[in-house]
A protein has these predicted regions:
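Protein kinase glycine-rich loop
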Residues: 15-22, 27
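Activation-segment/catalytic-loop signature of the eukaryotic protein kinase fold
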Residues: 79
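Conserved catalytic-loop aspartate of Hanks-type protein kinases
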Residues: 194
Length: 211
């Protein structure tokens, strides 16, 4: 199923503009025509790989994100499936990723970076208190608005202590430059793994490169 601008999803969400595309799927800026508000729509790609495995992962992302109500976590509004394609309807965050900010500016003064890190840590604390481990904390998944508000995004490889294991034992999950030593060894991630990754993010922002 090819997604195009103007297409209506679930008779409610209009696709306005593709924001990103990867191996797992596409992310669109959309519009909720019932509530008249912008939304972000993450759609599974059905033309590559094991579609059922991807759907299983997307369902897990929806499950893990559903109850994480916090100002520093991008909210999930709805999950919908049609013709073997899954759609995550999420809060639209008009902002730049911390990765974009690092790329444009190199380093940030501690007085500017610290509030970003604090907000990210608060969001992670809420996720951890619900038994959810992000497992892919990195600048690209930390959105920062023009007012300095932070939203953690993309729980696509997250793990919940209340769900069945999706990844195989020994499988490395996350982005290599930011994952904790235990993740790099294929061991189970813990809340401390996310904090380690946030430490790498902090180091990069202060020094201009990763440790």
């Amino acid at each position: 199923m090819k997604l195009v601008e103007g297409q209506l999803i679930h008779r409610r969400y209009r696709l306005d503009r593709r924001l990103a595309q990867g191996g797992m799927g596409e992310v669109w800026k959309g519009h909720d025509i019932q509530l008249n508000r912008p939304v972000a729509i993450k759609a599974l790609r059905d033309d590559q790989g094991n579609v059922e495995a991807k759907l299983h992962r997307l369902r897990a992302e929806a499950h893990n994100s559903a109850n994480l109500a916090h100002p520093n976590i991008a909210a999930l509004f709805e999950y919908y499936e049609h013709d073997s394609i899954g759609f995550l309807i999420m809060e639209y965050v008009p902002s730049d990723s911390l990765a974009d900010i690092y790329r444009d500016r190199g380093t940030l003064p501690a007085t500017e970076l610290l509030p970003i890190l604090i907000q990210t840590a608060r969001g992670l604390f809420v996720a951890h208190s619900h038994g959810v481990i992000h497992r892919d904390v990195k600048p690209a998944n930390i959105m920062v608005s023009t007012t300095g508000e932070v939203k953690i995004t993309d729980f696509g490889v997250s793990y919940s202590t209340n769900q069945e294991q999706i990844t195989q034992d020994g499988m490395v999950v996350g982005t290599a430059q930011y994952i904790s030593p235990e993740q790099a060894q294929g061991k189970q991630a813990t809340p401390q793994s996310d904090i380690y990754s946030l430490g790498v993010v902090a180091y990069e922002g202060l020094c201009g490169h990763r440790p």
